[in-house]
């Protein structure tokens, strides 16, 4: 029992005097990991609780309370002098490449930058704070995304190669700062230069017609009646018609067929003196070059040789000779049937007389005409041949 006035001894370990306290207990430790975080209290389970659940953790969440200042992730020391040392050494080591490129560390080590340096995340954070955490949309996009879209729009929607050319034409010709950027979906092509019109081209009326092809249309008889245009330039079709007339006047149909065998599509394989003179006259009369005149002449020869109607146009002498003869009816445009100069009334009918050979041949028939007397010749005994005795040819008027 302690005496009255004396302190009651504690049940713990005896206290040491100031002279007996060890010096090792004065060391300070900065390890705070063993301490529970503030705002969390643990309650042990009640022994009378039949469920015997584990310890409960009660967490107080306050919207007005500000989060506790956590130590920076850049280094372990979070004291002011330690952080200065960490910013000088550790951040410089991590962001050395970034400092060499842009002169400022913009990723990962933002604490090592000064307040005046441009930071990429500051604009993003300001935009997020302004829009109160609303997710970005096409109408509301952060600055980095707008810059990326602007760059993509200026370079094209599918790929970003500004020097691509298609058949020598730049696909994206609008790449200068002064020129406006065209629509992305539109095809950015420079208009092709229109070829100059040729001197001997077909008019628009012939181009739209079924016979508008300059090289493959065929002549009809009505084509030869086209009047020559003395004033002005002649069309290509009229030049070919005149060449057709010259060919039919100089050569016969057989000669034109032989000339067609000695030609390719547009060139003579062998030129005679008459062909050379004809080419030179065509070049002078119609103001064509020699190659064009030769090609037109070859096409005219091939066209004439492949026509179904091989009749040449009638000259003045032939027309006067034919004017006296009666005109024959046309049969589908081809003169295949010519009128005969003889009349049926002028023909004389001659009847041949029956000879012995005719009589023998008539007797050889197994079934002769009834009423013909039987032959008494020994070589034809027993045959039932009969003949009427009518002549071989009988005229019915």
Curated annotation (Swiss-Prot):
GO CC annotation:
anchoring junction; cell cortex; cell junction; cell leading edge; cytoplasm
* Biological process terms in GO annotation: developmental growth; epidermal cell differentiation; establishment of skin barrier; keratinocyte development; keratinocyte proliferation; limb epidermis development; morphogenesis of embryonic epithelium; negative regulation of keratinocyte proliferation
Report the domain of life of the source organism.
Eukaryota
UniProt lists compositionally biased (Polar residues) regions at 201-211, 375-388
> Which of UniProt's keywords are assigned here?
Cell junction, Cytoplasm, Developmental protein, Differentiation, Phosphoprotein
User: PANTHER family from the entry?
Assistant: KERATINOCYTE DIFFERENTIATION FACTOR 1
- In Swiss-Prot or TrEMBL terms, this protein is called Keratinocyte differentiation factor 1
The gene designation is Kdf1
């Amino acid at each position: 029992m302690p005496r009255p006035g004396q302190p009651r001894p504690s049940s713990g370990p005896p206290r040491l005097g100031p002279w007996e306290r060890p010096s090792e207990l004065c060391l300070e430790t900065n390890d705070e990991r063993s301490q529970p975080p503030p705002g969390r209290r643990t309650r042990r389970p009640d022994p009378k609780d039949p469920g015997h659940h584990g310890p409960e953790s009660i967490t107080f969440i306050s919207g007005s309370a500000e989060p506790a200042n956590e130590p920076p992730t850049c280094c372990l020391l979070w004291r002011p002098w330690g952080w200065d040392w960490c910013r000088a050494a550790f951040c410089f080591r991590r962001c050395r490449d970034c400092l060499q490129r842009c002169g400022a560390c913009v990723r990962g080590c933002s604490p090592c930058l000064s307040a005046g340096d441009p930071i990429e995340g500051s604009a993003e954070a300001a935009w997020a704070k302004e829009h109160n955490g609303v997710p970005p949309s096409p109408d509301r996009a952060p600055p980095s995304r707008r810059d990326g879209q602007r760059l993509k729009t200026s370079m094209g929607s599918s790929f970003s190669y500004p020097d691509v050319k298609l058949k020598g034409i730049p696909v994206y010709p609008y790449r200068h700062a002064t020129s406006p950027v065209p629509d992305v979906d539109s095809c950015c092509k420079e208009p092709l230069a229109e070829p100059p019109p040729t001197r001997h081209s077909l008019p628009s009326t012939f181009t739209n017609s079924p016979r508008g092809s300059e090289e493959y249309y065929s002549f009809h008889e009505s084509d030869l009646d086209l009047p020559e245009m003395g004033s002005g330039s002649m069309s290509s079709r009229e030049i070919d018609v005149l060449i057709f007339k010259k060919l039919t006047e100089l050569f016969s149909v057989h000669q034109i067929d032989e000339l067609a065998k000695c030609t390719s599509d547009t060139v003579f394989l062998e030129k005679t003196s008459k062909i050379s003179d004809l080419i030179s006259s065509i070049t002078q009369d119609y103001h064509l070059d020699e190659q064009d005149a030769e090609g037109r002449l070859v096409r005219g020869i091939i066209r004439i040789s492949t026509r179904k109607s091989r009749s040449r146009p009638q000259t003045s002498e032939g027309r006067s000779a034919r004017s006296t003869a009666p005109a024959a009816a046309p049969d589908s445009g081809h003169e295949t049937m010519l009128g005969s100069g003889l009349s049926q009334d002028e023909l004389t009918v001659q009847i041949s007389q029956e000879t012995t050979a005719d009589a023998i041949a008539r007797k050889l028939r197994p079934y002769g005409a009834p009423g013909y007397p039987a032959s008494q010749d020994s070589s034809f005994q027993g045959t039932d041949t009969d003949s009427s005795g009518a002549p071989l040819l009988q005229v019915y008027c």
